[in-house]
Amino acid sequence: MTMVTRVIMTDDDSQSLCFLCFLLFFFITAIAVAGDSLDSDREVLLSLKSYLESRNPQNRGLYTEWKMENQDVVCQWPGIICTPQRSRVTGINLTDSTISGPLFKNFSALTELTYLDLSRNTIEGEIPDDLSRCHNLKHLNLSHNILEGELSLPGLSNLEVLDLSLNRITGDIQSSFPLFCNSLVVANLSTNNFTGRIDDIFNGCRNLKYVDFSSNRFSGEVWTGFGRLVEFSVADNHLSGNISASMFRGNCTLQMLDLSGNAFGGEFPGQVSNCQNLNVLNLWGNKFTGNIPAEIGSISSLKGLYLGNNTFSRDIPETLLNLTNLVFLDLSRNKFGGDIQEIFGRFTQVKYLVLHANSYVGGINSSNILKLPNLSRLDLGYNNFSGQLPTEISQIQSLKFLILAYNNFSGDIPQEYGNMPGLQALDLSFNKLTGSIPASFGKLTSLLWLMLANNSLSGEIPREIGNCTSLLWFNVANNQLSGRFHPELTRMGSNPSPTFEVNRQNKDKIIAGSGECLAMKRWIPAEFPPFNFVYAILTKKSCRSLWDHVLKGYGLFPVCSAGSTVRTLKISAYLQLSGNKFSGEIPASISQMDRLSTLHLGFNEFEGKLPPEIGQLPLAFLNLTRNNFSGEIPQEIGNLKCLQNLDLSFNNFSGNFPTSLNDLNELSKFNISYNPFISGAIPTTGQVATFDKDSFLGNPLLRFPSFFNQSGNNTRKISNQVLGNRPRTLLLIWISLALALAFIACLVVSGIVLMVVKASREAEIDLLDGSKTRHDMTSSSGGSSPWLSGKIKVIRLDKSTFTYADILKATSNFSEERVVGRGGYGTVYRGVLPDGREVAVKKLQREGTEAEKEFRAEMEVLSANAFGDWAHPNLVRLYGWCLDGSEKILVHEYMGGGSLEELITDKTKLQWKKRIDIATDVARGLVFLHHECYPSIVHRDVKASNVLLDKHGNARVTDFGLARLLNVGDSHVSTVIAGTIGYVAPEYGQTWQATTRGDVYSYGVLTMELATGRRAVDGGEECLVEWARRVMTGNMTAKGSPITLSGTKPGNGAEQMTELLKIGVKCTADHPQARPNMKEVLAMLVKISGKAELFNGLSSQGYIEM
């Protein structure tokens, strides 16, 4: 009998079963989720590290410090960002980490990844599909790489910031871009090779605010909805069509619109006036016609109006005069013709007026532009102006850049042009000017450029030009100038630092495409190294940044120091005197022109011996062709280790062929032809042997290597036509010598053994760009002095001389008796140099890769920002440094006033007025580091012990051992723990990023210490920051408690110290963006200082009591 059991389930049983199933599902899910933990994230990061190290065996970045430790350490790895609970990895920042090769293909395993920054590397290949599986990614920056292929990121629907600029990505994005733009706020695809249409790809991107699609190959019409964005740039594409009124609806939110460099046409609509927040309107380089819209005059916020290179009507609307905030007006290349319009003389608010290439004729006085009171740059080049140069220009005392080149001006240059003390660039080239160069130009001490080429100027270069200590770029080629090159002229360009400092203070924001490209192309000698490198990369965007670099004194390219192949980024000068009638000898003092990288003296009548001191210059280009130089070619030319172009042809040099030329390993162009008295053998190996026979023509006494095809070469008749104006008798002597040499050679040719001159290859060039992990010597703007061993060299940043032996003597061989301080990065010794200067010698104690990075970072700061011979008054001056293996030494100015840390709690020695002065001094130093250095510098350890006082009590910031250059934004991934307990910003422990805002936080703590006389951390229940916030938030100061003042007069200084404490509280806000920047802080301090002046006659013993 078979029993069948039937189970009947009630409703309660069903619910219980469902609940059990839910628990089972939850348990399985929990197990799966548990697999995604910090442990698994660590394994992915270690896999990423191995991947990167295998493809970058030499130049490794921050990832080398990712070590196998417990899981908590993962969140402290440099470049790694975790959740606040440190439970998962959410971000990776490996910008500028010398990464090359294809992109890692397993980022998606980091399931909580929201931030990925791999910018400024050399990552190549296509963007892998794996990246599309990082579904939580919000910030992706792959800019400044060499990525290729097409763009496909369909899975990144949460992406808010996308930066793929400066790559080689191709293809049409019309179908791919809308798939991931739903949450996108920032989209930067500039400077790639994208193609196709973009007129409808943004319609579904509801959150988009900032778009930069410039410098691609997009075609068709523009997207009509750009009016709802904040910034929109499609500059330098192939877009066309008309810009319609409907694109500027009433709710236009644009602040920047850049349509330049396309083929838009028709009339531009006046409805642009609906964009009342517009700061920049750039229509340069299109095909717009008709009248300039009068409605533009109602956009009161407009600062930059770029309408050049179109065909607008020459009638300028009167309404534009209402733009009271207008700084830059560009109406160049519109072919206006006729006389210059009178209205330009009424733009009294404008600083930059660019009107070049408009086919203007007549004079320029009629428009009254020479009476504009605020004019800083006036560009009237490439027109047809004629007549005398107007003397009235000299009355514009604000003028810095005057460009009148490529016109038909004639007559003398007015002496009055020497009365513009702020003038930095004067370009009068390619006119019909006659007469002499005014001696009054010697008063132009701010002059950086003087361009007088291709005129008919005569006479000597006035000795007074040597007083132009900022004059780095001097071009008088192709005139009729004569006379000697006087020794006094070698002083030109000897100290441009004051001019660069003025430019660093100028904060006018000028966008790309405002005439600087044309200026740079005129002023950079495109055919001569090293400037040809810069000329080759001039695009509209690069011109803006390069122009800014030049004006502020930052180097555009690495320049060699004399006698070394080691390069550093520093400003470089040129001297162009070719095509004149200069005569006499070159003075030995030319060695003083220590920034000179290009020297062109060709096609003149210089004579005598070439001074050996020329070998002390950092030259990359030297052209002496077609002069009358004689004597031996100095062996010292072999010290020009980075010389690329050398032309000594058509002179009267004699003696043996200089073997030192074979040491010029970078020489790419060489010509020593037609110096018939040079003798000896041409090297058969080395750099010189790489040139063909055309480099040696007309030298019958030279012995050629066997591999030269000499048929008739060294016995060739030399005609008068080739030799120019050489005397006929001298010609006969040359031919006789050539024939005699040929006869002797036939008799002894079987016994001659060609000499082999081996080239001693110099060490591999170090460009200070992170391409090496170690280098024996790095140079800056000074010279080098060898120690007794000849290996350790001291690099001096001022003009004084001292050696490593002097350092040893000053510190008694680094004796313990000379120790005046110890820190986390080394020991400081006090000593006296032979010239009597007291110095503080800092010997770095850390070794290995990290110590090397720290030292190199500091050297980059020194090279780029000149903390030596010209030092900021609130930064401790550095006299020099040396590096040889483990020896890493800095030689600082000794500060006799000691450390602020020793005085900050002493309420009798440090009075309240002095405390405000110290706070102001430190702020000025940090303003320089953050806002006036390029790139910006983060100190990373602002504290009382890093503030030193000189003998007058002035404060200076010291210890840049961990300084880093910031290439993008204001953050930099730290490689070691930076900062000191009590001073470190709270976000540092989460982001591991050292930022300028972090410096502001540390500075805020320092101001609290100054205001209270209390330490940041003193063992109390409340740290200083917490106490200050409580006090200031509760407004307890208004009741006089708990803050009171000690001293005989309790009221003195209370208000100022309270204000100082308020600044400290503002600087220590929890959120970085809520903190002021250092410029804003300095402005607050200046106000307090102004109030403090009212108390100068009273007792100043006022301090806050706890």
Curated annotation (Swiss-Prot):
EC number(s) on file: 2.7.11.1
Keyword Transmembrane helix: yes
Active site, UniProt feature: D941 (proton acceptor)
Domain Protein kinase: 814-1095
Signal sequence range: 1-34
Phosphotyrosine: modified positions: Y983
GO molecular function, one term: ATP binding
Protein name: Probable LRR receptor-like serine/threonine-protein kinase At1g74360
UniProt xrefs under SUPFAM superfamilies: L domain-like (SSF52058), Protein kinase-like (PK-like) (SSF56112)
Organism whose genome encodes this protein: Arabidopsis thaliana
Superkingdom field: Eukaryota
A Pfam cross-reference name: LRR_6
One Gene Ontology cellular component annotation held by this UniProt entry: mitochondrion
Catalysed reactions listed for this entry: L-seryl-[protein] + ATP = O-phospho-L-seryl-[protein] + ADP + H(+); L-threonyl-[protein] + ATP = O-phospho-L-threonyl-[protein] + ADP + H(+)
Intervals holding LRR repeats: 86-109, 110-134, 136-156, 157-182, 184-204, 205-226, 227-250, 252-275, 276-299, 300-323, 325-346, 348-371, 372-396, 398-419, 420-443, 445-468, 470-492, 566-593, 594-617, 619-640, 641-664, 666-690
